[in-house]
């Protein structure tokens, strides 16, 4: 597996509306995309800094993994994951599994911005929740 670049940093927030002004100031750019990813129970907002994106993640349900992350983090949110772009998520997952890395997702699934995504378990990635992303065809 050879990632081409860091695709984005995922940042959990309690409210995109409250967090967006800070990230607009920090990045020097306006948010360019907001969408809801129903199956992940999350609302996302993207900001670009150079070639790397920041993805704000707001829970849409108290049962979402983002809501649970925020709760575990004292209600404050924070850095949730690092995402790497790969040419083929399915192949990258197979390589990771063969290398003994614990997978959260056994197969790619659709994420925000029409990316195909899969997560690697932090127990196998030195404590960092890691996402693999494949650009849409």
Model-identified regions with their sequence ranges:
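Vicinal oxygen chelate
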Residues: 1-2, 13-21, 26, 35, 45-48, 55, 61-63, 74-123, ...
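Long, hydrophobic N-terminal alpha-helical segment
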Residues: 1-40
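Residues embedded in well-ordered beta-strands within globular domains across many folds
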Residues: 7-10, 83, 133
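Extracellular/lumenal glycan-associated surfaces
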Residues: 28, 52-55, 81, 133
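Short connector loops at helix/strand junctions that flank enzyme active sites
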Residues: 42, 49-51, 74-79
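Short, conserved turn/kink motifs that form compact alpha/beta structural patches or helix kinks used as
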Residues: 53, 59-64
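Regulatory and interaction patches adjacent to catalytic/ligand-binding sites
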Residues: 67-73
């Amino acid at each position: 597996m050879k990632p081409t670049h860091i695709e984005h940093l995922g940042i959990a927030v309690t409210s995109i509306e409250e967090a967006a002004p800070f990230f607009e100031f920090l990045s020097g750019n306006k948010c360019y995309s907001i969408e809801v990813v129903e199956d992940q129970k999350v609302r996302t907002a993207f900001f670009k800094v150079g070639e790397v994106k920041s993805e704000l993640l707001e829970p849409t349900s108290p049962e979402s993994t983002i809501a649970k992350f925020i709760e575990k983090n004292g209600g404050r949110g924070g850095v949730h994951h690092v995402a790497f772009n790969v040419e083929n998520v399915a192949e990258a997952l197979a390589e990771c599994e063969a290398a003994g890395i614990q997978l959260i997702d056994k197969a790619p699934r659709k994420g925000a911005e029409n990316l195909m995504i899969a997560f690697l378990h932090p127990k196998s990635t030195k404590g960092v929740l890691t996402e693999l992303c494949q650009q849409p065809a």
